[in-house]
Swiss-Prot record:
This is Putative glycerol-3-phosphate transporter 4. It comes from Arabidopsis thaliana (Mouse-ear cress). Its main location: membrane. The keyword Transcription regulation does not apply. Residues 281-313 are annotated as: Disordered.
Length: 544
């Protein structure tokens, strides 16, 4: 399927170029691409957090003690006193919540946690299914427009979910449908942003660059938690409307300023080996060397610069799902991500609820505080993503690094569950360590590994497969992301220990699924050449 050859320069860039009178360098555009895609996907993740924040409001636990009045500033100095506090008499919604224990129909019954798990799985199942379609469309359509409409549509349906509060809706099907629609639109995000970054950056040190860039996941989670928790006292509906509005604004930013392809702003396709671009070769190469020094990345291919805007590039055909699945390494990493995201998304959707329903230092924390406290898991995730990317680049061993982190996540989670209630300080430290090991391999696989495989040498530079490969890997992972929260909804009724045992099994399976690739990487390090295991080749070497 040929790509549209009539793409236009983004209107915001076109306007600024007219005002400025000349174009920017490739180096400047690369920085802009990293920044805009970072903001875009942070918005995606921010809009996913509200459901985890409001769980304790929709389904209150009547067994917990009512809030007690106290002066929080005497416990924690500013700014901690305004963020990490116990249940306060000043939190009007929480006082009413514990006084009446009403919650919100249809989530306040005995099967409330199960229904909360069902709306999570509805979102993630549609997200997973939509990912496969979105990946192929992303390789076939204009990524800028595709991402724009995905963000606006997602923000719209996230906001509609929150309107159920103001419209006094208690029909389960309404919330289910809103989550399903939001999940389909959310599927446009990840394949698109990875493909855009892959269009502008080569493979060398891709793990470190994308490890840093992938902090948008945790930054989005943190911002989403803080926004949703911050407006919760005005009604839980605002916890959805505010992130949904921010999401739509992000879509406008993408439409105006995202140059999804170098060709759209007058530069060659770095993944092309065609040599059809004949102008500005020396200038482009000089800029590429500067970017390599600043960002640790090189530019592949021997394409040459063009001063055109986007209408003069060569057409690219997108690859099919089956062809993309045949790329060595795609299936093992996709299956690994299934279990990795099962673990990560269980924390994403249930950690605030878990924190509000368990004692920390002998005290219960408020719903708002639980949401704020859960952000520290993502702080650890930021460090984990960067560290995992750096190590995988240093040793040229993506699979070994990912597997090692997954195995390390097992004791980290068990220790957190066993000793996280000792005190708030211990809880924070153990939570960050768990976040480091859980989110590290998840970040590595969804970014650097996906981009590596999407530009695999078997494609010979003749196809666009970045979005499709990313969709296959992340779509499979999202099936696990749907399963984890669903199982948690049922297992939590048996006790949280059962949930953590499930997480341990998931992490173990994720590591074991990479065993074959780990062995191949170790054999290569020892000087053996195993031609029967080609899956690791694009992940270990810089050979073109």
């Amino acid at each position: 399927m040929a790509m549209n050859s009539k793409r236009k320069t983004p209107p915001g860039i076109a306007l600024l170029r007219r005002v400025r009178g000349r174009n920017w360098s490739p180096k400047t555009f690369r920085y802009a691409i990293l920044f805009i895609t970072f903001i875009a996907y942070a918005c995606y993740h921010a809009s996913r957090k509200p459901s985890s924040i409001v769980k304790s409001v929709l389904h209150p636990d009547s067994s917990t003690k009512p809030p007690q009045e106290h002066n929080s500033d005497k416990i924690y100095p500013w700014p901690m006193g305004n963020v990490f506090v116990k249940r306060e008499i000043g939190d009007i919604d929480e006082v009413l919540l514990h006084r009446k224990s009403k919650g919100w129909e249809p989530f306040n019954g005995k099967d409330g946690t199960s229904r909360l798990g069902e709306i999570d799985v509805a979102f993630l199942a549609c997200y997973s299914i939509g990912m496969y379609v979105a990946g192929h469309l992303g390789d076939s359509l204009d990524l800028r427009l595709f991402l724009t409409w995905g963000m606006i549509g997602s923000g719209f349906f996230v906001g509609l979910f929150g309107m159920g509060y103001f419209w006094n809706i208690h029909a389960f099907w309404f919330f289910l449908v809103m989550q399903m629609a939001a999940g389909l639109f959310q599927a446009t995000g990840w394949p698109s942003v990875v493909a855009v970054v892959g269009n502008w950056f080569g493979k060398r040190k891709r793990g470190l660059i994308m490890g840093i860039w992938n902090a948008h996941t945790s930054v989005g989670n943190i911002c989403g938690s803080l926004i949703a928790a911050g407006v919760l006292e005005y009604g839980w509906g605002w916890s959805f409307i505010a992130p949904g509005f921010v999401m739509s604004l992000g879509g406008v930013l993408v439409y105006l300023f995202l140059a999804a392809y170098p060709e759209d702003v007058g530069f060659p396709d770095i993944n092309s080996n065609s040599g059809k671009f004949i102008k500005r070769k020396r200038d482009v190469e000089e800029e590429e060397e500067e970017v390599e020094e600043d960002l640790g990345t090189d530019v592949e291919g021997d394409g040459e610069g063009s001063s055109g805007s986007g209408s003069g590039y060569e057409n690219k055909r997108s690859v099919g799902l089956l062809q993309a699945c045949m790329i060595p390494g795609v299936i093992p990493f996709a299956l690994c991500l299934f279990f990795s995201k099962l673990v990560a998304y269980t924390f994403l959707y249930w950690l605030p609820f878990y924190l509000s329903q368990t004692t920390i230092g002998g005290e219960y924390v408020s719903v708002k505080t639980a949401g704020n406290l859960s952000t520290l898991f993502d702080v650890g995730g930021i460090v984990g993503g960067i560290l995992c990317g750096y190590i995988s680049d240093k040793f040229k061993a993506r699979a070994t690094t990912a597997a090692a982190f997954m195995y390390a996540a097992i004791p980290a989670m068990l220790v957190y569950h066993s000793y996280g209630g000792v005190s708030q300080t211990v809880n924070i430290l153990l939570m960050m360590v768990a976040g480091l090991f859980v989110n590290g391999p998840y970040a590595l696989i969804t970014t650097a590994v996906s981009a590596d495989l999407g530009t695999h040498k078997s494609l010979q530079g003749d196809s666009r497969a970045l979005a499709t490969v990313t969709a296959i890997i992340d779509g499979t992972g999202s099936a696990g992301a749907a399963l984890g929260p669903l199982l948690t909804g049922f297992l939590s009724t048996l006790g949280w220990q059962a949930v953590f045992y499930m997480l341990v099994v998931g992490a173990l399976c994720a590591g074991l699924l990479l065993t074959r690739l780990v062995i191949a990487e170790i054999r290569e390090k020892l000087g053996y050449v195993d031609e029967e295991v080609p899956a690791s080749e694009p992940l270990l070497t810089d050979r073109r």
